Amino acid sequence: MAMASALRRLSSSSNKPLQRLFNGGHLYSMSSLPSEAVYEKERPGVTWPKQLNAPLEVGDPEIADIIELEKARQWKGLELILSENFTSLSVMQAVGSVMTNKYSEGYPGARYYGGNEYIDMAETLCQKRALEAFRLDAAKWGVNVQPLSGSPANFHVYTALLKAHDRIMALDLPHGGHLSHGYQTDTKKISAVSIFFETMPYRLNESTGYIDYDQLEKSATLFRPKLIVAGASAYARLYDYARIRKVCDKQKAILLADMAHISGLVAAGVIPSPFDYADVVTTTTHKSLRGPRGAMIFFRKGVKEVNKQGKEVLYDYEDKINQAVFPGLQGGPHNHTITGLAVALKQATTAEYKAYQEQVMSNCAKFAETLVKSGYELVSGGTENHLVLVNLKNKGIDGSRVEKVLEAVHIAANKNTVPGDVSAMVPGGIRMGTPALTSRGFVEEDFAKVAYLFDLAVKLAVKIKGEAQGTKLKDFVAAMQSSAFQSEISKLRHDVEEYAKQFPTIGFEKETMKYKN
């Protein structure tokens, strides 16, 4: 008690004016810290509070500098990676708050630690807002907001609702699926999901680029899955949830919709919702939803059906899923993330958010249209959401080489497999999305410009490939270092940066940046 009293006196002993932290931003302010002499007078040797209250640029200038470099990268570059976005200042304030200090194993009202009354308030509010954001009836749906990320969230569901070696069907990874849905090759189980469960992929019709639902149904009849995943990481078309629901009903299988990439679009109501058909829905929270880096699991509750005896049969997902998350696979939740997620979910119910997601869709349509006019092939021929998957094979180049040039000119995108690829190491495509740049204020005409800059980068990659002294990626990278190509890279990078720098930064003020030039 004596030390606590002394520390309280120390915290109130200075009458100096407030100082801004984090390079003059408006995130936090605090009283200037008392001098060493005050510490020695009040409690000799107790100097660590000064270290704990020091701003980042004082306490760790090396890390502070790395953050400043990342700010500059985000400002000067074109962020086209589908799974990224720029979260809001208020979300970052919540994530960087004192909520990170508390440990809270368990659930609201049933914790294994004391002092969680405000943590309970934040988590309960987050759950309420999650249901509201997706227009769900709390009597029919519940939600767990504790999963740390999307892949663990999916594994929580498998663990909760399946037995070891039960069967799962999901979209094949090279056809746009995700690792966490149980990807394996003929010789190796890549995802841990395929170790603990038996998995079979369904695929696209390679001639159309759309999911082959007829073949999916035939495969399900033979494989008899216990769970079918409707979700993708690189599929530019809408899912036919009703069709998969019929397949699930026929097989008495659970329908898990993984909407990690599209949840922001679903929340805004600009694409169809999986909640009308799915039993369980998972999502990450930092992609199109534009929150912090976390995940959620939604599950049906209440009456499932009336049996032959006339008795109501209830869904039993809630307890199973909650127990799989904790104590099954996780310990204490990340309370700062849950608090930040609550903020993001409130934003997701606003008119501004709906307008943003509508612009995401419009931008992607324009992006796709411009790319096609420039001679690019898109998997499925176009887009119905926020992404384009470019098949580069008709350009005589692969995604790995194009990605290297894009990165050199400060365009962030990622190589991606496309149907027909024989090697994931040399994928034939590039995956790009519109959410992040739309957050910065890009509209249709800007994405026409982005498509033009992308085209210049691809043409440069083709030239470099033609001059490379070998067929390996390292030979291509070596060829990039020639003075002639470095000059072209430098010019294109300058054009990219000058265009990107016209737009607002998100979460920090341009004026406070250390590296503006």
From Swiss-Prot:
GO terms for biological process: glycine biosynthetic process from serine; tetrahydrofolate interconversion. It holds the Pfam family SHMT. Its cofactor is pyridoxal 5'-phosphate. One of its GO terms (molecular function) is pyridoxal phosphate binding. It catalyses: (6R)-5,10-methylene-5,6,7,8-tetrahydrofolate + glycine + H2O = (6S)-5,6,7,8-tetrahydrofolate + L-serine. The modification N6-(pyridoxal phosphate)lysine is found at residue 287. Its EC number is 2.1.2.1. The keyword Lipoprotein does not apply. Its main location: mitochondrion. The keyword Protein transport does not apply. Keywords: Mitochondrion, One-carbon metabolism, Pyridoxal phosphate, Transferase, Transit peptide. InterPro entries: PyrdxlP-dep_Trfase, PyrdxlP-dep_Trfase_major, PyrdxlP-dep_Trfase_small, Ser_HO-MeTrfase, Ser_HO-MeTrfase-like, Ser_HO-MeTrfase_PLP_BS, SHMT-like_dom. Catalyzes the interconversion of serine and glycine. Belongs to the SHMT family. Homotetramer. This is Serine hydroxymethyltransferase 2, mitochondrial. It comes from Flaveria pringlei.
